Amino acid sequence: MVFAEMEYPQHYSEFHAELLAFVHRHFSRVESGLQGDSYVWILDGEDKVAIDTFTSMKHLIKSPTAGAHVQKVIETLLQRFKLHVYQTPEREAHEDA
């Protein structure tokens, strides 16, 4: 499910390093990559929040389930970045209705 979309003026590939540096300062288990698309995964036990451009030209904040793990990531990102937080999470095309 998609919970929010980040807003920034530059191409996502130019924004990746800034986003990654910020996330690393606030979360201990982070995986990332930039090759064609940008992704940052924040891992906490069994929970994972993805911030990626796999289906968008801007970074989307995603997780299979809603919960405190998603809220924590959104609240942390809002400290520095502009986000459009969806009132109701949106399903991705590959997710069952």
Predicted features along the sequence, with ranges:
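Short, intrinsically disordered low-complexity segments
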Residues: 13-68
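Short, compact, well-ordered microdomains
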Residues: 64-92
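Short amphipathic beta-strand/extended segments with alternating polar/hydrophobic composition
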Residues: 50-53, 72-75, 96
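Terminal, regulation- and interaction-focused segments at domain boundaries
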Residues: 1-14
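Short proline/glycine- and acidic-rich turn/helix-capping motifs at secondary-structure junctions
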Residues: 36-45, 87-97
